[in-house]
């Protein structure tokens, strides 16, 4: 194992509780942790039809899974008390921006109250460590050409962003109320950019939308073609979460540090939706897919978004590993293998190993 990857050895034989295991990022993280020899405990809703990863990667056979809504505090707390994990990775969320417009109540309950439930159970059961995942959308977006850093103002003028900003405010409240006096950090929050990668089939996400249109030979509709986002492969922020978890478990971070980290791509990966679409279609060798631009927006979305990742580079020695072309190639190669009915457990293991060799 390369020296820069040795932090991953920290997870061997550790009991790791992951929320959101049936989701896109949660499934990738659970699979990776299982590869590392961790004893993974999952809490999540049952997989939706669009959530293909959990079953494709055979996670039901690999991890101890509880099907539960994180809004059910009593049941959630009983599981965390019973399992007493070494570390919790909290990823469960309502993660679709458009869905937050149509169903704000569920979005707010899950992203705010569900997160409070995790923090409270972590506190009263004296769990050792917590990596608490929110989103880059937690920052008050001014639609300016600036990269948001961890000390920038939180906020949101739409339901999704405000739910994520609120989750961060709740985290800050718990940290300062109960954990600020500890010598070493036990919990940290993370804010990642727009993740892409194999296995995501959610609606209103650019890569799944392209894949579905390509396979069905239907026109592709772009909702916000000029919106710029910090695109990164799903393994990039997950490597940051795992590195951060390693530092927490090994008491390498003191509480005088701000307990929040951005994980995003280098600035050259921040491109607009139209640019990403062209790269994906080129990789798919598709030049006859008609693209429609959806006129008139039902809900607000920021035009510009990028993250400042200097803190993660300096304090954690974390770096993005893939450029934009590699990110697209990793993503499309996974989908091609999936639709070609290849052994996706082996393929996904190989892709993680390839990522670690970069």
Predicted regions and their residues:
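N-terminal Rossmann-like NAD(P)+-binding domain of SDR-like oxidoreductases, especially those catalyzing
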Residues: 1-192, 196, 338, 349-357
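Residue-level signal for the nucleotide or nucleotide-sugar donor/cofactor binding architecture
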Residues: 6, 71, 102, 110, ...
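NAD(P)-dependent short-chain dehydrogenase/reductase
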Residues: 142-147, 151, 160, 168-254, ...
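Conserved C-terminal active-site "lid" loop/helix of NAD(P)H-dependent oxidoreductases
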Residues: 234, 259-260, 297-319, 330, ...
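Non-catalytic, hydrophobic alpha-helical segments
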Residues: 237, 241, 263, 276, ...
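C-terminal "lid/loop" region of Rossmann-like NAD(P)-dependent oxidoreductases
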Residues: 255-262, 271-277, 282-304, 345-351
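Short arginine-rich
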Residues: 333-343
């Amino acid at each position: 194992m390369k020296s820069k990857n040795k932090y991953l050895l920290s997870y061997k034989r550790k009991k790791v509780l992951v929320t959101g295991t049936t989701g896109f990022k949660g499934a990738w993280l659970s699979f990776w942790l299982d590869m590392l020899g961790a004893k993974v405990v999952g809490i999540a809703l049952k997989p939706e039809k669009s959530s293909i990863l959990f079953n494709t990667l055979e996670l039901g056979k690999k991890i101890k899974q509880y099907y539960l809504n994180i809004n059910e505090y009593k049941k959630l707390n009983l599981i965390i008390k019973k399992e007493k994990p070494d570390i919790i990775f909290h990823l469960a969320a309502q993660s679709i921006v458009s869905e937050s417009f149509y169903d704000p109540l569920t979005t707010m309950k899950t992203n705010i109250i569900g997160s409070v439930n995790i923090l409270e159970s972590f506190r009263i059961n004296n769990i050792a460590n917590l990596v608490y995942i929110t989103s880059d959308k937690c920052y008050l977006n001014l639609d300016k050409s600036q990269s948001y850093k961890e000390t920038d103002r939180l906020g949101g003028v739409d339901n999704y962003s405000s739910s994520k900003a609120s989750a961060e405010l709740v985290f800050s409240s718990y940290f300062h109320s109960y954990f600020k006096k500890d010598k070493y950090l036990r919990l940290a929050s993370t804010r990642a950019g727009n993740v892409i990668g194999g296995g995501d089939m959610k609606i209103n996400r650019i890569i799944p939308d392209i894949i579905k249109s390509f396979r069905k030979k239907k026109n592709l509709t772009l909702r916000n073609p000029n919106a710029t986002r910090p695109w990164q492969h799903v393994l990039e922020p997950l490597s940051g979460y795992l590195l951060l978890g390693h530092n927490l478990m090994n008491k390498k971070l003191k509480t005088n540090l701000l307990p929040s980290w951005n994980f995003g791509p280098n600035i050259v990966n921040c491109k607009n939706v139209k640019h990403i679409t062209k790269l994906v279609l080129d990789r798919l060798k598709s030049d006859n897919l008609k693209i429609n631009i959806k006129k008139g927006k039902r809900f607000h979305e920021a035009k510009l978004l990028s993250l400042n990742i200097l803190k993660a580079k300096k304090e954690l020695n974390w770096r993005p590993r893939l450029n934009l072309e590699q990110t697209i190639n990793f993503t499309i190669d996974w989908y091609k293998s999936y639709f070609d009915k290849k052994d996706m457990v082996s393929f996904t293991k190989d892709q993680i190993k390839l990522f670690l060799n970069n």
